[in-house]
From Swiss-Prot:
It comes from the Eukaryota. This is Cytochrome b. The lineage of its organism: Eukaryota, Metazoa, Chordata, Craniata, Vertebrata. One of its GO terms (biological process) is mitochondrial electron transport, ubiquinol to cytochrome c. Binds 2 heme b groups non-covalently. Component of the ubiquinol-cytochrome c reductase complex (complex III or cytochrome b-c1 complex) that is part of the mitochondrial respiratory chain. The b-c1 complex mediates electron transfer from ubiquinol to cytochrome c. Contributes to the generation of a proton gradient across the mitochondrial membrane that is then used for ATP synthesis. The keyword Membrane applies.
Amino acid sequence: MTNIRKTHPLAKIINNTFIDLPTPSNISAWWNFGSLLATCLILQILTGLFLAMHYTSDTTTAFSSITHICRDVNYGWIIRYMHANGASMFFICLYAHMGRGIYYGSYTLAETWNIGIVLLLTIMATAFMGYVLPWGQMSFWGATVITNLLSAIPYVGTDLVEWVWGGFSVDKATLTRFLALHFVLPFMALALTAVHLLFLHETGSNNPSGILSDSDKIPFHPYYTIKDILGLIILILILMLLVLFSPDLLGDPDNYTPANPLSTPPHIKPEWYFLFAYAILRSIPNKLGGVLALLLSILVLAIVPSLHTSKQRSMMFRPISQCLFWLLVADLITLTWIGGQPVEHPFIIIGQLASILYFMILLVFMPIAGMIENSILKW
């Protein structure tokens, strides 16, 4: 009799995705981040669900409801900090996953890559709205500054901002709709994850060497299930170290002050994982130009596959491209640092140079490096 996991309609899907899936035998720990991201998403949905049971989306009580969760709800503090720091872990895994995609040329799987970009935008929107909900000073002013960027759109900008706000400023209507959207977007992300996986399994995974691995595949279970569980243990360990020892390490002290529309914080800045994009936004003196640069900083990823000039897929055997990749990583770290600094000399010029370098590496230097490497190998 054939095993039920190979015949039952539901079990068959799970079997073909997580058990009998033919997987390249040489994929490294950099391929662990997909499963870690799925874990983070599930964790965020579950902790968020419990937080939503106690949260009130009213400007007068939102801040107090967070205090109530931390002080009066059983294990409310740990749920709240797991959710807040879980978001940070989510973005660490997300950026590592994307970095691996660029380094090993996984972006040549166009459908998977493009769905990944849509997923990234969905998760960024979710995280931004979640940051507004505690209704602290940085929540309020962050929401005001970022939603105000829509006013840079010619002709319809002002109307659009007021439509998003549900009034003439960030207020109760804004908070309520942000809660609704913050609740629903992760489920959209979950659906997109399924599509992402569907497209990936149409072609099969890439591997570090970037060459076709059809001749050397092994079943996903038990080899990669064990490997993923190890990654999972490390992720949970780091998350719990953060939650239990320094839960506010990655947060902003200003968010422990209730939102006050009459008092602007000295430095308005988003969460650390958006600082690189915020630095790019601020590096352009023109409002519309800044908004376009902000959008392009993410959307530029969509044209990376079109700019692949090398005859090799992966950067494993391409030293010039490797140097450029690590320069890009260093540049993004610099942008993240600049995004958290005040707008004054020398930070302004450093931010502008780092922003130019970011786009130059992706759009100019990497394609040229690919062509140089081809000519070195006489291809």
